[in-house]
Every structure is written in structure tokens, then in C-alpha cells.
Design a protein with these regions (language model features):
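C-terminal motif of bacterial Sec signal peptides marking the signal peptidase cleavage site
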Residues: 14-17
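Conserved C-terminal helix/tail region of periplasmic/extracytoplasmic solute-binding proteins
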Residues: 38-45, 360, 374-471
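Hinge/lid segment of periplasmic solute-binding proteins
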Residues: 41-63, 127-180, 210, 331
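Extracytoplasmic "Venus flytrap"/periplasmic binding protein-like
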Residues: 86-156, 169, 192-193, 297, ...
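Extracytoplasmic/periplasmic substrate-recognition and gating elements
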Residues: 96, 320-387
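A structural signal for short loop-to-beta-strand junctions that line the ligand-binding cleft
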Residues: 112-113, 121, 125, 149-190, ...
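Extracytoplasmic/periplasmic solute-binding protein
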Residues: 165-176, 181, 191, 208-260
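Glycine-centered hinge/linker elements that transmit conformational signals in sensory
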Residues: 214-216, 255-289
Length: 471
């Protein structure tokens, strides 16, 4: 029964990938088996945005055009992108028509569009963008359109270059998320039980693997009826965040631009052993019938933490707005007590320009507008208002979330474990998920991290060698 719940959760999280694998805050409602073109929703009453007094340098003038976007959400109305779109539309005379599909449909739809000569002009970055899709020559290099020395890209060249393919830059992420996944908890229940607030522990530099483990134990032990559980959530992403806290990514980009596997690294092994301890001691588990995106265990105070993408926090914020007695909050994954620094997973989000696009120059200007929504003081303030209206964050939530957008203040770990071919990426997801949670997989049931890794390492290394051979 746990397998069924977790597998359903894995499906749910993959369908929400446009929300939680990138910028983390998008309100996508698309699924893998449905699609729609455009939208009839008019959100001007709910979220009016004015950019008339803002002046930006997002690039030289371009010919007005209607750009085609293929992805998971309406980028003309999403709270964190709408101000950038309005500026782009009003000052460059361009519009964007959105074809909204589920994340699992993007590769198929993009392949069909390119082969038929009807390439869109913008497409979402996804887990399989690099290196899988990039290696298929399905994107347009943006080096001639983008100025990496422009102020909005200051300090980001090292991260942009992590996604170079054969010496060319196809991807200029406009959103950089240190700690794209958080541990959400019911702060009100923690206070009732008498537990230390994890946010305060984090602020004091005391939020470590050990203090998290101690907190979970105390949370579970506080219920004499045995109805409280510990950690649940997005299985593989939660496991990856713990591994990345050692400072060692599972798959990284070497100085020569080639992929490097760290699955056999001693620090990765140590993190995996820590996760197996959490699992074996019952500190990481799913309640019966619960999947990763379920919020009921946190709302009812029956689970200590939910490891989930930033996107889910908005749902908790909206509950708090309706009932001011509720108090939910979140912290990043804890620090590895043996690491020399506090290391955080980092994810990026942005758009790529598909091969065959007729409006690559206009698309590049829009990407610049999106990045400026994070760096230009006026557009950033307008974007904050837009986000607050659409997401309903408290001021405390917003300020804490935004603190993780400035990657230069953190020791960020760039990790790309899911960008290989579909089969290998799923193997990695399964191994990570089964290391931290008992998923009752026929293939991995009862196996240790070492056993699962050794059984999979040949497949993983073969794929890495394949991609490196293309470079």
C-alpha cells in the first residue's frame, strides 16, 4: 500500500515538475495527458500589474511579433512572470501565445513542432533539458543575442557556463534558486509540543542533520498513541537535497565541460547511510494512503516535515490567510555537520529558444526582461506585489524565500542527476527514493544504498560516457 501511495506521489510530482523543478513557484494546472492553448482567465481584477513608470535596458528594439511558447503554465499571467511580460509587451510591441502542456509532453510536442517547421520561440527548462534534449540539437544558441556582461547577468557566468554544450550557450537561466526544496512544518504544533522552532535553529546556525533527526524523534515521541510520523515528501528530490548538503553533487560538470559521476564518492555514501538510518528507524516514512504532495499530515500536525518544492508553500499561505490561528513555515534542508560549509542544492529556471524559431532575438529580449524582474529595483518591487497578490505569502515567508534567490550569498551545489536518458534517469530516481523511504519496490526491496548503486552504476556510467563522447 505504501508503494501505491508513493508511486502515485512520484507521478504527481512529475506532473508538477514545471512548478517544482524550476523556479518553484509557478501555478501550472496542466497534466501529462491534457493540453490547452491559451487561456480564458482574466486575472486583471485579481492581480492588476502596471509597468508604465519602469524603464529597462532589456536589449535593442526588435520587430513586433507574436511569439509562441510551449510549456506548463501561462507565462503572461503567472504572478512572478507577469510584470516582465507586461513590460516586454508594452515596450517592445510583442505578445506571447501560450500552448500549455504537461511536463511529460514537452519533448514529444517540441520534436513534432521542429520537424514540421513550426518551432515555438520559447520552451521551459526541465530536468531532461541538459544534457538529453540539448544533445539533440533542438535549441538555438543564444550567444549572439545575449550580452553576458550586462548588469542583470553579473556574477552568473560560472553558472550559465555549467549548461554549455559544445562551447555554446543555449540556456540563460533567469531564476536561480538556492534550496529549491524545503522542509515544511506546522510551527503552531511545534510550539504546542515544546519543540525548538527549526527556523530559529537555522538562524542560529544550529540546523544540522543531527538537530533535524532529534527534532523528528521528539515529534514522534510526543504522541503517546503513536500516530505521529517524521519526514515524507518528494522522494528523490528530498534524498538529493541531503546528498548535496555534503557539497558533492551526484552528477556535475567538470572544468572541461564534461559530465562527472560522484555516485561512488565517500561523502555521497555517508549521506546515503544517514538516510538509510532515518528510514530504518522509522523517521522517514509515508502514512497510509498519503502521497508526497498531500498536505493533510502537516495541516493536522501528524507529520513533522514535508520535503517539497517551493511551489507548495503558497497553498499553506492561502490556508493561513483564511485562518489566522494557523502557522506553517519552512526551512532549507539541514547542514551536513561534517562538511566544511553549509552547502545547498541549487536549481535554475528559464526558457530556451527551440531550433527553427523565427523570433530568437525577440525571445532573448523577453528572457532579459524576466531576469531584470529579479535585479532591477523598480521591476523587482512590482514583481513582489504581483507575487504577494497571487501567492498570498506572509511577509516573513516572502522575505525568507527571496533570500535564497541571491546565489552569491550561499555555497550552491549544481547537480544534474535527472538529465540523462529516460530509463537511466528513472533508475536514479528509484535508487534515491528507496534509499530514504521504504517504497517496497520489487527491484530494490531490502537492498542497501551500496547494493542499489553497484547494480545501477554501469548503466549510469555508460550514459555519461555517451554524452561526454558527443562533446
Amino acid at each position: 500500500r505504501i508503494l501505491a501511495g508513493v508511486m502515485a506521489g512520484a507521478t504527481a510530482i512529475s506532473l508538477a515538475a514545471c512548478s517544482n523543478s524550476g523556479n518553484g513557484g509557478f501555478d501550472s494546472t496542466a497534466t501529462s495527458d491534457t493540453s490547452s492553448t491559451g487561456t480564458t482567465i482574466d486575472d486583471e481584477k485579481e492581480n492588476p500589474v502596471s509597468v508604465g513608470d519602469i524603464s529597462l535596458n532589456a536589449g535593442e528594439d526588435v520587430e513586433p511579433a507574436e511569439l509562441q511558447y510551449l510549456g506548463c503554465y501561462d507565462i503572461t499571467k503567472a504572478g512572478d512572470v507577469k510584470p516582465a511580460y507586461k513590460y516586454f509587451s508594452e515596450n517592445y510591441g510583442c505578445t506571447i501565445k501560450c500552448t500549455i502542456v504537461g511536463s511529460l509532453q514537452i519533448l514529444e510536442k517540441l520534436t513534432t513542432a521542429i520537424s514540421s517547421g513550426e518551432s515555438p520561440d520559447l520552451v521551459d527548462y526541465a530536468d531532461n533539458t541538459f544534457p538529453l534534449i540539448m544533445s539533440k540539437n533542438m535549441y538555438t544558441p543564444l550567444d549572439e543575442y545575449m550580452d553576458i556582461s550586462a548588469p542583470q547577468w553579473s556574477g552568473l557566468e560560472q553558472y550559465i557556463n555549467k549548461y554549455k554544450w559544445n562551447g555554446k550557450n543555449y540556456y540563460y537561466p533567469w531564476a536561480y534558486n538556492v534550496s529549491p526544496y524545503f522542509l515544511i512544518y506546522n510551527r503552531g504544533v511545534f510550539e504546542q509540543i515544546g519543540l525548538d522552532d527549526p527556523k530559529e535553529l537555522y538562524d542560529e546556525g544550529k540546523w544540522t542533520w543531527d538537530t533535524m533527526t532529534d527534532t523528528i524523534r521528539k515529534f514522534i515521541d510526543s504522541d503517546s498513541d503513536g500516530n505521529r510520523t517524521g519526514l515524507y515528501g518528494a522522494t528523490e528530490y528530498t534524498a538529493q537535497a541531503i546528498i548535496d548538503s555534503t557539497g558533492v553533487p551526484l552528477i556535475e560538470i567538470g572544468e572541461d565541460g564534461k559530465l562527472v559521476s560522484n555516485f561512488s564518492n565517500a561523502n555521497v555514501d555517508r549521506a546515503a547511510n544517514f538516510m538509510q538510518t532515518l528510514k530504518n528507524e522509522g523517521l522517514a516514512s509515508f502514512q497510509e494512503g498519503v502521497i508526497d504532495v498531500d498536505t493533510t499530515p502537516i495541516k493536522e500536525g501528524t507529520a513533522a516535515f514535508q520535503g517539497m518544492g517551493e511551489w507548495i508553500i503558497s497553498g499553506y499561505a492561502k490556508l493561513m490567510q483564511k485562518d489566522d490561528t494557523l502557522d506553517y513555515f519552512f526551512v532549507p534542508f539541514p547542514r551536513d555537520p561534517e562538511a566544511d560549509q553549509y552547502y545547498y542544492s541549487m536549481s535554475t529556471f528559464g526558457y530556451l529558444v527551440p531550433a527553427g524559431s523565427k523570433y530568437a532575438k525577440q525571445a532573448s529580449v523577453f528572457i532579459n526582461c524576466c531576469r531584470l524582474s529579479n535585479t532591477d529595483e523598480d521591476l523587482r518591487a512590482t514583481t513582489k506585489d504581483s507575487i504577494m497578490r497571487s501567492k498570498k505569502y506572509t511577509d516573513e515567508m516572502y522575505e525568507f524565500l527571496m533570500s535564497f534567490k541571491d546565489i552569491n550569498n550561499f555555497h550552491a551545489v549544481v547537480d544534474n542527476p535527472y538529465g540523462l536518458d529516460e530509463t537511466t534517469s528513472q533508475i536514479i530516481r528509484d535508487v534515491l527514493g528507496n534509499t530514504l523511504f521504504e517504497m517496497y519496490s520489487e527491484q530494490y526491496q531490502g537492498q542497501t544504498w551500496t547494493q542499489m548503486r553497484e547494480a545501477s552504476l554501469g548503466t549510469i556510467n555508460k550514459q555519461i560516457e555517451y554524452y561526454n563522447g558527443l562533446l
